[in-house]
């Protein structure tokens, strides 16, 4: 008997019998050849299915409707003879829930707003030279991640980017950009190369529904955590969203340009939910892809009205297929999972194993947010912080323990952290240095599982947070010397800690959103990178640049095994000072035989005694590039500047 209620459908979908009858691991989507194209759709509850063909991605009448043939395992298929390159299509499906039109869940490109899927020949769409694009080899010691939205990166009129490319994929391809084209102060890709960051994490670049691609973008803005088509690049980031091949080509051009600069690309992926409950997956197989409560209603652990059921076999297959597609076809270097706590541990470990099978796949980064956006009906082990020791050691998490210890809680603007003088937080600073490998609070397999950070796109920027803790009515545009020192100290802590350092784009030039803690659909002007600040706060930019280089010169800070954290020697200093020593690993090419690091969160100078031997001053609270030159050699007692991270190298 056919189920009648959502609860009965839930029982069916989670039964072993349904899995046996419908699990399918053959090809899905459009399989193109010049001689013809196979279309295959997994829709086991459908009673009828047809494909509608169009010449254009938007507008224009349907030029033909053809029935699909039902195959085994819930698959419907049709063969379209002849060269179908450039054709668009959707499906008409009749299920127990009614009749509707749906795009292809496995579509690789689409027309405006992702309504119609596109058939195309990759060889005719790929940019010139794409076959020569390779992922840059980035050793652990050099790894650092800079997070940005495609839109924010170049929307500023002063970015020096061509007007037509601002806020687009192609902005990343323009060489030699400078502030207002002054020829002096680098911006965009030119700036990133000078900064020395090794990965750019791109906020969602697959097709999302919160920006209307058919309308001008001047007053539209969204971060894009509202997925519509998981395997299709976002059209508003292309120069022509009406032509499906353009978004594919220009996305690849962006990736190739970053790779050409030696920078890896991390893709922010949002499989945990879809933009609306009425979406392509729910139209093709109603209810199957989304987690349900016991009464059959949709679980809402995402806070967006639905959550992806990663534990259901064909949903799991879909997620893994999609990630592997981006890794293979777009040469993506890493994946950041939004609300990773909504996925089950088994799925994430299976995905890691599949990525590892790809050429160079073991170097593809994989990490995520180890929490949820609400109560979830997931009854298996969640891929969250509590189950970190169940995840593969090369699946990392954003460490909110480190974030909150350094700068204070993210939900209370006035709550201070270590850099603002919060008593007692120094214990967590020590744990952060060792990537929590020596703490009972959070036992990772290895330091590589910990993302050390203080700011990301969510919540207040670091600069805004520092000012809001200090002042009841902060002047966000002002140059505040105390906040600058605290900013340098915060960076000095997480960039000398073990784990993978990560920061929000513009943190290094005091990025402000004027106290707005959730700017996901605020104005483009509020969200965009203000490239004038990169020049105004050039000394802060240089401080980050120096720390990035210093970290690379001492490879053990980026070590992936637990031997590094175990080798850290903490000094018995008076609170709230933190000091530690780490010997270099034999044969790793370190510039110094050991590092000695001190953090002083007080607003007065402090005197400490160095361990025995001679120590070169590498970085203090003002400059992080002393290590590049012949700075002074210290022994015995030394003075720590107020609000400073001070680093010495043993010589």
Indicate residue ranges for each PLM-predicted region.
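Beta-strand-rich binding/interaction modules
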Residues: 41, 47-58, 62, 605-622
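Substrate-binding/active-site clefts of carbohydrate-active enzymes
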Residues: 151-330, 339-359, 365, 377
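The feature marks proteins involved in alpha-glucan
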Residues: 1-34, 38, 70-174
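Carbohydrate-binding surface patches
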Residues: 31-47, 567-609
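Glycan-recognition and catalytic regions of carbohydrate-active enzymes
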Residues: 21-26, 496-516, 526-595
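C-terminal beta-strand-rich structural cap/linker in extracellular carbohydrate-active enzymes
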Residues: 43, 85-89, 630-651
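Conserved alpha/beta catalytic core and glycan-binding cleft of carbohydrate-active enzymes
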Residues: 120, 352-353, 357-509, 516-520, ...
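Conserved, mostly hydrophobic/aromatic
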Residues: 41, 91, 148, 202, ...
């Amino acid at each position: 008997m056919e189920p009648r209620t959502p609860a009965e459908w839930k029982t069916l979908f989670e039964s072993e019998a349904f899995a046996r009858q419908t699990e399918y691991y053959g090809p899905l989507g459009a399989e193109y050849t010049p001689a013809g194209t196979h279309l295959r759709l997994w829709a086991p509850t459908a009673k009828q299915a047809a494909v509608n063909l169009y010449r254009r991605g938007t507008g224009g009448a349907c030029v033909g409707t053809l029935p699909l043939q039902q195959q085994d395992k819930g698959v419907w298929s049709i063969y379209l003879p002849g060269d179908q390159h450039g054709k668009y299509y959707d499906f008409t499906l009749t299920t127990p829930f009614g009749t509707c039109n749906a795009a292809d869940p496995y579509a690789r490109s689409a027309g405006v707003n992702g309504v119609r899927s596109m058939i195309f020949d990759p060889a005719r769409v790929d940019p010139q030279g794409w076959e020569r694009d390779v992922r840059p080899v980035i050793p652990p010691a050099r790894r650092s991640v800079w997070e940005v939205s495609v839109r924010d990166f170049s929307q500023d009129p002063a970015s020096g980017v061509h007007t037509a490319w601002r806020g687009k994929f192609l902005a990343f391809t323009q060489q030699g950009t400078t502030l207002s084209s002054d020829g002096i102060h680098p911006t965009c890709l030119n700036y990133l190369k000078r900064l020395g960051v090794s990965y750019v994490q791109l906020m969602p670049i697959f097709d999302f529904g919160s920006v209307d691609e058919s309308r001008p973008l001047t007053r539209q803005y969204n971060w894009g955590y509202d997925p519509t088509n998981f395997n299709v690049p976002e059209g508003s980031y292309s120069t022509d969203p009406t032509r499906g091949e353009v978004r594919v080509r220009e996305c690849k051009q962006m990736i190739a340009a970053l790779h050409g600069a030696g920078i890896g690309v991390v893709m922010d992926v949002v499989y945990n939910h879809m933009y609306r409950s009425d979406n392509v997956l729910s139209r093709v197989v109603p209810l199957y892809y989304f987690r349900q409560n016991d009464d059959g209603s949709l679980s809402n652990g995402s806070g967006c009205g639905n959550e992806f059921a990663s534990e259901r076999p064909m949903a799991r297959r879909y997620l893994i297929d999609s990630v592997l597609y981006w890794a293979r076809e777009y040469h993506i270097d890493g994946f950041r999972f939004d609300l990773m706590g909504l996925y089950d541990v088994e799925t994430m470990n299976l995905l890691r194993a599949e990525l590892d099978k790809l050429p160079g796949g073991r170097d593809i980064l994989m990490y995520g947010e180890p929490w949820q956006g609400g109560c979830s009906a997931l009854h298996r082990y969640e891929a969250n912080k509590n189950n970190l020791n169940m995840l593969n050691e090369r699946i990392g998490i954003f460490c909110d323990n480190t974030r909150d210890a350094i700068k204070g809680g993210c939900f209370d603007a006035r709550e201070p952290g270590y850099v603002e003088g919060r008593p007692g937080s120094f214990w967590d600073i020590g744990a952060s240095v060792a990537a929590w490998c020596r703490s009972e609070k959070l036992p990772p397999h290895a330091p590589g599982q910990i993302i050390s950070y203080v700011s990301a796109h969510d919540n207040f920027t670091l600069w805004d947070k520092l000012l809001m803790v200090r002042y009841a009515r902060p002047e966000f545009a002002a140059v505040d010397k105390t906040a600058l020192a605290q900013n340098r100290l915060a960076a000095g802590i997480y960039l000398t800690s073990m784990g993978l350092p990560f920061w929000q784009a513009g943190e290094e030039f005091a990025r402000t959103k004027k106290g707005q803690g959730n700017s996901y659909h605020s104005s483009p002007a509020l969200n965009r990178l203000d490239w004038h600040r990169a020049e105004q706060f050039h000394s802060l930019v240089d401080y980050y640049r120096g720390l990035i280089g210093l970290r690379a010169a001492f490879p053990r800070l980026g070590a992936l095994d637990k031997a590094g954290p175990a080798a850290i020697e903490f000094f018995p200093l008076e609170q709230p000072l933190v000091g530690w020593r780490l010997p270099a690993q034999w044969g790793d090419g370190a510039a110094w035989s050991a590092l000695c690091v001190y953090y002083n969160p007080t607003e007065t100078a402090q005197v400490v005694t160095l361990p025995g031997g001679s120590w070169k001053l590498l970085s203090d609270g003002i400059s992080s590039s002393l290590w590049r030159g012949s700075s002074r050699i210290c022994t015995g007692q030394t003075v720590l500047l107020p609000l400073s991270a001070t680093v010495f190298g043993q010589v």
